[in-house]
Swiss-Prot record:
Record organism: Cryptococcus neoformans var. neoformans serotype D (strain JEC21 / ATCC MYA-565) (Filobasidiella neoformans)
GO biological process: maturation of SSU-rRNA; mRNA splicing, via spliceosome; tRNA processing
Pfam families to which the protein is assigned, alphabetical: LSM
Assigned protein family: Belongs to the snRNP Sm proteins family. SmF/LSm6 subfamily.
Record gene name: LSM6
PANTHER family: SMALL NUCLEAR RIBONUCLEOPROTEIN F SNRNP-F, U6 SNRNA-ASSOCIATED SM-LIKE PROTEIN LSM6
Subunit (UniProt): Component of the heptameric LSM1-LSM7 complex, which consists of LSM1, LSM2, LSM3, LSM4, LSM5, LSM6 and LSM7. Component of the heptameric LSM2-LSM8 complex, which consists of LSM2, LSM3, LSM4, LSM5, LSM6, LSM7 and LSM8. The LSm subunits form a seven-membered ring structure with a doughnut shape.
Protein name listed in UniProt: U6 snRNA-associated Sm-like protein LSm6
Length: 88
């Protein structure tokens, strides 16, 4: 009796968080960090530690835009959530 051959990496379940994160790379997102500050911008990179790289980034405290950056790097342990600002 032979065992089935490995099929490579397992595919994420449709609608899973890992699929969502893979689909938002290259899209405009909002990232909230632990201090309550939001960053919006184009998600260019995301890794397994939730480290985030944004381009055309803006920093928001509530409804007030406090800064604009060309590039912004957020350390994953500060990230509370990431939400898409455009349709996937």
């Amino acid at each position: 009796m032979s065992s089935p051959e490995p099929q490579g990496e397992p595919q994420p379940v449709s609608g899973s968080p890992s699929e969502f994160l893979r689909n938002i790379v290259g899209k405009r997102v909002k990232v909230r960090i632990g201090s309550g500050v939001d960053y919006t911008g184009l998600l260019t990179c995301l890794d397994g530690y939730m480290n985030v790289a944004l381009e055309q980034a803006e920093e928001w405290a509530g409804e007030v835009k406090t800064a604009a950056y060309g590039d912004c790097f957020l350390r994953g342990n500060n990230v509370l959530y990431i939400s898409a600002l455009e349709d996937l």
